[in-house]
Amino acid sequence: IKIRLSKINKEICLGINIGPNKDTAPDNIINDYLFCYKELHEYADFVTLNISSPNTPNLRKLHNIESFTKIIKAILIERDLHATKPKILIKLSPDEEVSSYRNIINTINQTDIDGVIISNTTNDEILKEQLNVGHLPGGISGKSLRNSSNKILKEIKSIISNEKIIVAVGGVFDVDSYNEKFELGADLVQMYTGLIYEGPNLVKRIIENDKQISRNSWVSIKS
């Protein structure tokens, strides 16, 4: 990965998503984050600390404020040791209690963490049964994620510092769902499942058809 990253045109904005291996013991999870950060940070404009992948057993337990605080403290200390200092964002689950989000955001507001990404895929059991995918591993993405992701986006916008960056993701397939994220408080928007089904032309269509887009108002996340 390092070799490929070293060949990328750095005029583009590059984000790197890091997390622990599936078989990493709980006591060593911080070491996985630190290893990935040390190896890759110099190539990134922002590094995402993924504490919410549904495919890594028990990863979402890192929303516990004690565990969360230990991880971000270790990463922030590591960032200060290097000349290259990418922004650090936390990718959150859409399935936590409101109290958990409040604890996490209050902690972020008091640290040099740069922002959050809302949200990862959902493991909502009722939704999985409705979609007849309850027997399958992993989380639900795409249009079915839109409502739950937007609900958390609205909640977090109400409590996060204005200095922090909010990146919204989940259910963006057209101009309306794209603009909806900004109306709820996002600074930037990411797309995943929409690109799989619609292809890269989705981005072009959104930009061409969205009369509200102003380049002067965009938030930069480049280092």
Question: Which stretches of residues belong to each language-model region?
Answer:
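Hydrophobic faces of well-ordered beta-strands that scaffold small-molecule active sites
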Residues: 1, 14-18, 47-50, 88-92, ...
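Active-site beta->alpha loop and helix N-cap motifs at the rims of alpha/beta catalytic domains
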Residues: 1-48, 53
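Alpha-helix-loop-beta-strand connector modules within alpha/beta enzyme cores
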Residues: 2-11, 64-88, 135-164, 206-219
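Active-site beta-loop-alpha junctions enriched in small/polar residues
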Residues: 19-23, 52-54, 91-95, 119-123, ...
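Active-site glycine- and acidic-residue-rich loops that bind
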Residues: 21-34, 61-67, 89-110
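Catalytic cores of alpha/beta
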Residues: 31, 96-110, 157-162, 172-189
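Glycine/Thr-rich beta-alpha phosphate-binding loop at enzyme active sites
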Residues: 54-63, 105-162, 198, 202-203
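C-terminal helical cap(s) of enzyme catalytic domains, especially alpha/beta-barrels
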Residues: 125-142, 182, 188, 193-223
